[in-house]
């Protein structure tokens, strides 16, 4: 991507590389699967290092967190020297990714599962014997954020049509807040 920007010599803006409401792409193959036949080319810079999208703030009053993302809330608060207030809502979104149901796979998603049902694809975090997949076997929220959408897509493929996915609990600290935000939206009822 750096080579494309250097060759362009101008500022470059591009739309999101995924259909609205679907699981975000973090690899070129994800973009190809989601936008096949609708785009001319894909610039493949490798897997996204951060995984979850950007942190979005509202600064038109008290500093507000509109969407937790790849920069932990604690880091933003340390730089700004203030505690962020909650901002935005699913009923009146003011930033991307605020709809109640978003980042949704085809399979139903259940959260904070310790003992999965026999018909669920179990996605672990930390030590989770029997998990089909893991956001981070080491229990690292940074790794979980980087792997989230790729693992969600894999679990959806394994679950198949009408299937179910169960996610082990992920701590809310650091990037865990962004991971849990995306998981709650993936698990929300779809309208």
Each language-model region and where it sits:
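Active-site-adjacent structural elements in enzyme catalytic cores
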Residues: 1-191
């Amino acid at each position: 991507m750096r080579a494309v920007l250097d060759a362009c010599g101008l500022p470059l803006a591009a739309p999101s590389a995924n259909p609205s409401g679907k699981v975000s792409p973090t690899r070129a193959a994800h973009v190809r699967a989601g936008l096949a036949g609708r785009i001319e080319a894909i610039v493949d810079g490798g897997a996204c290092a951060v995984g979850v999208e950007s942190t979005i703030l509202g600064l038109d009053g008290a500093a507000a967190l509109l969407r937790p993302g790849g920069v932990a809330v604690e880091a933003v608060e340390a730089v700004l020297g203030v505690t962020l207030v909650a901002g935005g809502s699913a009923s009146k979104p003011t930033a991307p990714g605020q709809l109640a149901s978003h980042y949704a796979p085809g399979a139903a998603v259940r959260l904070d599962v310790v003992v999965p049902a026999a018909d669920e694809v179990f996605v672990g975090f930390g030590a989770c014997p029997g998990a089909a997949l893991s956001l981070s076997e080491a229990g690292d929220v940074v790794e979980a954020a980087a792997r989230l959408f790729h693992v969600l897509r894999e679990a959806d493929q394994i679950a198949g049509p009408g299937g179910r996915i169960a996610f082990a609990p992920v701590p809310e600290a650091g990037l865990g807040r962004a991971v849990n935000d995306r998981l709650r939206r993936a698990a929300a009822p779809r309208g």
